[in-house]
Amino acid sequence: MGSLAAEKTVTGWAARDASGHLTPYNYTLRKTGPEDVVVKVLYCGICHTDIHQAKNHLGASKYPMVPGHEVVGEVVEVGPEVTKYSAGDVVGVGVIVGCCRECHPCKANVEQYCNKRIWSYNDVYTDGRPTQGGFASAMVVDQKFVVKIPAGLAPEQAAPLLCAGLTVYSPLKHFGLMSPGLRGGVLGLGGVGHMGVKVAKSMGHHVTVISSSARKRGEAMDDLGADAYLVSSDAAAMAAAGDSLDYIIDTVPVHHPLEPYLALLKLDGKLILMGVINQPLSFISPMVMLGRKAITGSFIGSMAETEEVLNFCVDKGLTSQIEVVKMDYVNQALERLERNDVRYRFVVDVAGSNIDDADAPPA
């Protein structure tokens, strides 16, 4: 892609305002630093958070914004101090691309909880430039925030694991919920939820999918291998399932009550929140007190856990269920994702979309 010292012009697909509609956008990458890796983007998954950010649902969006944080690409250049990667490596980039490296979370190697973390897009890098994500032809990323995609994992399959797969793996590991025989619940059967079923089943758990309707019963049990299916609006079934689960992975990204799901937990059970919601959630305290239950949360995972989950999926033969689309379909894909019309993750074939040839309107 040229000299390391030179800035590189690339094309991404950017939101220009809170409509969230993406169009081609030309911009320059920062100069490659000593520990930077230049990645030619091959594939990028589409996460529900991309909708939140593109449409300013969280109130902090800055435009133009190139979304995408489930990035798989090929290393094309490396800085002189890069030791982990070389040209030709297939690598992944996830939700964050920077941290302070000095705080307690950073020193404990859980850098995703650093208060000075730098998001892969809709943020400002240390040089003052806006960060832009993986709906683009290339990225420049510090080697600390790059992982190698292991052999045996197709790049388009790897993309959702960098967010959706990692997001369910990390809390199960952290909270000691990896032992065979546990009974887990997965609330919501989208991109994260379907990986929750697959990961938990591969750990030997009895898995119950919890959904608001019976519509996904067949795919949950027949396609994904869930052991049980619970319709949350069925009061009798919910009552019969009370005190039966060791944990629930709550992936729902919209406001919803917590009390019906707290009632499903055993003594010391955990309700693990993963959906990004910008409204307060509520519950009455006896729902947790009278079972020593915990409402907790988890945010993606560390770089070490990212490597772990990729290798875990290779070892267990796990793949994400995806629909691959070209970049010129990305707006339709976002619309379909918003109405839950995907099984279960869109992945954009960036390299196959020839986006550098697109005509970009003025910024």
From Swiss-Prot:
SMART domains: PKS_ER (SM00829)
Documented EC number(s): 1.1.1.195
Keyword annotations of the record: Lignin biosynthesis, Metal-binding, NADP, Oxidoreductase, Zinc
Enzyme class: oxidoreductase
GO biological process, one term: lignin biosynthetic process
Residues given in the record as NADP(+) binding sites: 49, 167, 188-193, 211-216, 251, 275, 298-300
Gene3D superfamilies: Medium-chain alcohol dehydrogenases, catalytic domain, NAD(P)-binding Rossmann-like Domain
Pathway assigned in UniProt: Aromatic compound metabolism; phenylpropanoid biosynthesis
Domain of life: Eukaryota
Binding site for Zn(2+) 2: C100, C103, C106, C114
Subunit structure: Homodimer.
Family assignment from sequence similarity: Belongs to the zinc-containing alcohol dehydrogenase family.
Name recorded for this polypeptide: Cinnamyl alcohol dehydrogenase 2
Gene that this polypeptide is encoded by: CAD2
